[in-house]
Swiss-Prot record:
Gene name as annotated: pgk
Subunit structure: Monomer.
Protein name: Phosphoglycerate kinase
Enzyme class: transferase
PANTHER family to which the protein is assigned, alphabetical: PHOSPHOGLYCERATE KINASE, PHOSPHOGLYCERATE KINASE 1, CHLOROPLASTIC-RELATED
Length: 404
């Protein structure tokens, strides 16, 4: 990776180190549903405090549209959970600008950790509009002024240019201060980058999810890079329509059928679609179901891939040396239509001798549900960011970091 990393930082002891982490965790009534993203940030935080740095953490949490949102989306419970994981006191400051924050930072001792309030409170707490989300340079400069060096460890927001990532990095570099990648960001770029740019072959991509429109760029980019691209999930049926198959009441993007036709022609035998599907007479876990090959009957909608498709996909995957999986094979949140997604997750968990990378909420949830997460090479923490990276796009949060 041609970007400077936290390991390149010199003389951290006594320095104020700003760290953009991704603590955007599911939270309800102050209870954290999944602390994975907090855990993922620990190596970078630990490195800074072990070397005597003062770790000042910034993160967003959810989208803030009202004062009501602010009560639900405070980072206070996240700071408490971080303290438990680090087994040390973590200071929380209920603001992200002003005297209270500045005093708390100036009072920090070496090896201490401080979490400031949700950066997106800046999207409503002022007369200037969405200062954080719109990357207000003055806000980036202000936050940069609070530290001696900046570490971006938030891959989940790397595809967005916000004041708390691009803004701070830009201001730091303008003042000849370091702006580097944390261990998590470095790991994401390493695994996703190597998978796409220098994969051990055969390289198989598995793409699921509801919409072709969300994944068009990724499909096109990966068709040029991968040996096979497996397509499942709701977007399958736009491809079915493009092939002239009947799709019943299945999800379809009418305005993307022509594009799907072009992709099928361009891909040749690289593109692998499900040969059979589990269909239902209603979008419900209790609906009447059947397994059908090819055409989907009128009055039915396809909600998962069928057993022959699972066997086909596993046959393609069994010899793979690199696999990237993003998106479910069916309506994963309904048990009766989760089998395809779970089967792929289980197969990848038991695939030996291959680099296996999983991204996206449902795919990640599937491997966790199966307990095979630790058997995979890498679980990406970025949904949209990993998709844009797989599409070959430059991510602003990474571009803003200092080059080696």
């Amino acid at each position: 990776m041609a970007k400077q990393t936290v390991a390149d930082l010199k003389d951290i002891k006594g320095k104020k180190v700003l760290v953009r982490v991704d603590f955007n965790v599911p939270i309800k009534g102050g209870v954290i549903g999944d602390d994975n993203r907090i855990v993922a940030a620990l190596p970078t935080i630990q490195y800074i405090i072990d070397n005597g740095g003062k770790a000042i953490l910034l993160s967003h949490l959810g989208r803030i549209k009202s004062d009501e949102d602010k009560k639900e989306l405070t980072l206070k419970p996240v700071a408490a959970r971080l303290g438990e994981l680090l087994n040390k006191d973590v200071a929380f400051v209920a603001s992200n600008e002003g005297q209270e924050l500045e005093d708390a930072i100036n009072a920090m001792t070496d090896g201490q950790v401080l979490v400031m309030e949700n950066t997106r409170f800046q999207d409503i707490d002022n007369d200037f509009g969405k200062r954080e989300s719109k990357n207000d340079p003055k806000l980036g400069e202000y936050w940069a002024s609070l530290g001696d060096m900046f570490v971006n460890d938030a891959f989940g927001t790397a595809h967005r240019a916000h004041a708390s990532n691009v803004g701070i990095a830009t201001a730091m570099k303008a003042n000849n201060k370091p702006a580097v990648a944390g261990y998590l960001l470095e790991k994401e770029i390493k695994f996703l980058g190597e998978a796409v740019d220098a994969p051990e072959r055969p390289f198989v991509a598995i793409l699921g999810g509801a919409k072709v429109s969300d994944k068009i760029g990724v499909i096109e980019h990966l068709l040029a890079k991968a040996d096979k691209v497996i397509v499942g999930g709701g977007m399958t049926y736009t491809f079915y329509a493009a092939k002239g198959l009947s799709i019943g009441n299945s999800l379809v993007e009418e305005d993307k059928i022509e594009l799907a036709k072009e992709l099928i022609e361009k891909a040749g035998d690289k593109l692998v679609l499900p040969v059979d599907n589990v269909v239902a007479d209603a979008f419900s876990n209790d609906a009447k179901t059947e397994t059908v090959e090819g055409n989907i009957p009128d009055g039915y909608m396809a909600l998962d891939i069928g057993p022959k498709a699972i066997a086909d996909f596993e046959n393609v995957l069994k010899d793979a040396k690199t696999v990237v999986w993003n998106g479910p094979m069916g309506v994963f949140e309904m048990d009766n239509f989760a089998k395809g997604t779970l089967a792929i997750g289980e197969f990848l968990g038991n695939l030996s001798g291959a680099t296996t990378i999983v991204g996206g909420g449902d795919s990640t949830a599937a491997v966790k549900k199966l307990g095979v997460g630790d058997k995979l090479t890498h679980i990406s923490t970025g949904g949209g960011a990993s998709l844009e990276y797989l599409e070959g796009k430059t991510l602003p949060g990474i571009a803003a970091i200092s080059d080696k």
